[in-house]
């Protein structure tokens, strides 16, 4: 048997130490609970989705909206891998450029809006052909597949000087998480017949993040019909109450659904596991 001071003994000790340290290094990267995906609402249409594999997606990151749980969130989020922008309006583009510059997040949106956001300061090397697409296209984002689906709205983009730029077509997102749920973020939209095709194309939608405020989008009654088309397990209302004009409420959505689906109202800033 080699002595404790022999070269073989020292190498063996180093190998044991490395193996012992490996689990600690692997656990340093924060992840959602095994098999669970965390969804955090930040008010309006802004969400953060963290997959079981640790991929972080920010959707329509207007993190400085009036319903945000605290100020300065764009400077505080520790990690974002991808930023999904449904259309070009200020309340959905939000803090995307600042967040991208700080985190290195890649942009997932339509090609036209992507080009306009690059012109407005979004880092060009984070908005390439690998993540820009168009309706019907699927982008692989870590352990999530993001498909751009139809929405009925407008999408003009105005830069910080008020100049208008192309915004392409508005869209929603279907996010299929490997080992996790299928999420549908409607974006801003009216009720559409296209929604009927989502279960056939993607299977069961687990969580539908749906606009309900009215005036610019579906109101609660229209959203309830949309829920009937999509048939999700859980409905999370969004895009309501931020401004006086978008006055639809989760209570009105519940009443219109008549118990046909679970309505779960998220508290801004509090992650929920699905």
Curated annotation (Swiss-Prot):
SMART domains: Lactamase_B
InterPro entries registered for this protein in UniProt: Metallo-B-lactamas (IPR001279), RibonucZ/Hydroxyglut_hydro (IPR036866), UPF0173 (IPR022877), UPF0173_UPF0282_UlaG_hydrolase (IPR050114)
Keywords: Hydrolase
Pfam families, alphabetized: Lactamase_B_3
Ribonucleoprotein is among the record's keywords: no
Record-level Gene Ontology MF annotations: hydrolase activity
Top-level taxonomic group: Bacteria
Entry similarity comment: Belongs to the UPF0173 family.
Protein name as catalogued: UPF0173 metal-dependent hydrolase AnaeK_1127
């Amino acid at each position: 048997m080699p002595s404790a001071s022999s070269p073989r003994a020292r190498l063996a000790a180093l190998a044991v130490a490395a193996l012992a340290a490996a689990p600690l290094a692997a656990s340093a990267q924060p992840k959602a609970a095994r098999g669970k995906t965390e969804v955090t609402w930040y008010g309006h249409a802004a969400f953060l989705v963290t997959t079981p594999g640790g991929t972080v997606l920010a959707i329509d990151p207007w993190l400085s909206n009036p319903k945000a749980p605290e100020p300065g969130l764009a400077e505080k989020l520790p990690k974002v891998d991808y930023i999904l922008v449904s259309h070009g309006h200020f309340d959905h583009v939000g803090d995307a450029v600042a967040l991208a510059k700080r985190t290195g997040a890649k942009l997932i949106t339509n090609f036209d809006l992507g080009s306009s956001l690059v012109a407005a300061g979004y880092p060009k090397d984070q908005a390439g052909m690998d993540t820009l697409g168009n309706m019907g296209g699927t982008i692989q984002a870590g352990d999530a597949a993001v498909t751009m689906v139809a929405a009925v709205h407008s999408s003009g983009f105005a830069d910080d000087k008020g100049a208008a730029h192309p915004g392409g077509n508005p869209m929603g997102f279907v996010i299929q998480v490997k080992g996790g749920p299928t999420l549908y973020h409607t974006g801003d939209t009216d009720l559409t017949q296209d929604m009927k095709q989502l279960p056939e194309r993607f299977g069961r939608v687990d969580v539908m993040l749906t606009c309900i405020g009215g005036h610019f989008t579906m109101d609660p009654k229209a959203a309830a019909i949309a829920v009937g088309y999509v048939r999700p397990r859980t409905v999370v209302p969004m895009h309501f109450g931020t401004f006086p004009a978008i006055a639809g409420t989760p209570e009105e959505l519940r009443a219109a659904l008549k118990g046909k689906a679970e309505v779960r109202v998220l508290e801004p800033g509090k992650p929920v596991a699905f």
